[in-house]
Design a protein with these regions (language model features):
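Flexible, active-site-proximal loop/turn residues at the rims of small-molecule/cofactor binding pockets
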Residues: 50, 171, 277
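Substrate-binding and catalytic surfaces of secreted/luminal carbohydrate-active proteins
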Residues: 146-159, 163, 174-352
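N-terminal catalytic cores of secreted or lumenal carbohydrate-active enzymes
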Residues: 1-163, 175, 182-192, 196, ...
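Short, well-ordered beta-to-alpha junction loops that form the rim of enzyme active sites
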Residues: 106-107, 167-170, 219-220
Length: 352
């Protein structure tokens, strides 16, 4: 993933330094001593920003260097393709080194489309908590879908292979924050109902523009929402809600297949989750992924792991990241990789 630092590095670091980073990330060459120049990433996730960077301190996000992101869309509806220049630098370098695919993802709609004019929701906008967590105005779902499809087409026309676009990130998380205080990043939650509205609109826009790009669903903040009611009924049981046409429960009004998305042309049978928080112990690594894989298999759904880094505390062998040795960190990542690949049988794995 190019979040959070790649835009800053690509814009402001020296050519030699950022070229060196690109080589380490993307090169597949072997030097004269038989050593690999880089790790040869085959896929690169690109954050499509919502415009908090242009707002400056008014964005309410204190971290101005990493967590504010530019937006290609201007308020008047025109596009500025010179935005996110640092990220585009690394996209170009990835393509030059032979990176096969690019996945676009977004954390928020453009601020022009949000309820509070910010790139994250704030508390109190609605008496309905689930409406409060969602920051996209009802009248702008089609506009947001048009924006995402337009950005996708732009980069496809630039020669990038973009097999997937992910329009929603970690809907289970309550992104409501206090501007200028605890707002850490762009974010927006979507219930199953809101997800279906947005995904259906994006499916239609991708089709209108003649794009082969598909929609990547899920981006669950951990593995449990894939198969159970872990994070609230309006944000969980993703396999059943999106890929089981006969599924009904309290959270879809006992209406069979109310939020089914498996019949949309640009929705493949894929769900993705993040390996955060289920990485502390061998037992949690194994159990959550076994259950996710078992549920996915029932409906022919492939699983992807699309984000992981060390966010947790109370690991088996150490308290937290700062207390860990380099070997502790290496073994923790190896355990996550093992269980994601061998237990969850993921078809794709991405580091945050």
């Amino acid at each position: 993933s190019d979040a959070w630092d790649m835009d800053f590095i690509g814009k402001y670091w020296s050519n030699s330094n950022k070229e060196g980073i690109a080589k380490l990330l993307f090169s597949r060459n072997i030097d004269s001593k038989g050593r690999p120049e880089g790790i040869g990433l085959s896929m690169w996730r690109v954050n499509v920003g919502g415009g908090s960077s242009e707002q400056g301190d008014a964005s309410g996000i204190p971290d101005k260097y990493e967590r504010r992101v530019e937006c290609f869309l201007n308020q008047d509806g025109s596009y500025n393709w010179s935005k996110q220049a640092g990220q585009q630098y690394f996209m170009q370098k990835a393509k030059e080194y032979g990176c096969e695919s690019f996945v676009l993802f977004t954390n928020t709609p453009p601020v022009w489309y949000t309820k509070n004019g910010l790139a994250f929701p704030t508390k109190g906008a609605s008496s309905n908590q689930d409406e409060d967590k969602n920051n996209l105005k009802d009248e702008h779902y089609e506009d947001f879908a048009e924006f995402l499809a337009t950005v996708t087409k732009h980069f496809v026309d630039q020669g990038y292979n973009i097999p997937l676009i992910s329009p929603i990130n970690e809907p289970q998380v309550d992104w409501r924050k206090t501007p200028g205080a605890d707002a850490e990043q762009e974010g927006c939650s979507y219930t199953h109902e809101k997800t279906k509205i947005l995904v259906t609109a994006l499916n239609d826009k991708l089709e209108e523009k003649g794009l082969a790009t598909n929609i990547l669903l899920g981006e669950a903040s951990r593995w449990e929402p894939i198969y159970t009611t872990n994070s609230g009924g309006y944000y969980s049981n993703l396999v059943d809600h999106y890929f089981n046409p006969d599924y009904k429960n309290y959270y879809n009004g006992n209406e069979e297949g109310k939020y089914y998305l498996g019949n949309l042309k640009h929705v493949p049978n894929i769900l993705c989750a993040h390996s955060y928080h289920t990485d502390k112990t061998w037992s949690s690594l194994k159990t959550a992924r076994e259950k996710a894989y078992e549920k996915a298999q029932q409906f022919g759904v492939e699983l992807y792991q699309t984000e992981w880094s060390m966010l947790s505390t109370d690991y088996d062998n150490y308290e937290n990241y700062d207390d860990a040795s380099y070997m502790d960190l290496a073994l923790s990542m190896a355990r996550v990789l093992h269980h994601d690949l061998a237990t969850a049988n993921v078809r794709s794995w991405s580091y945050w």
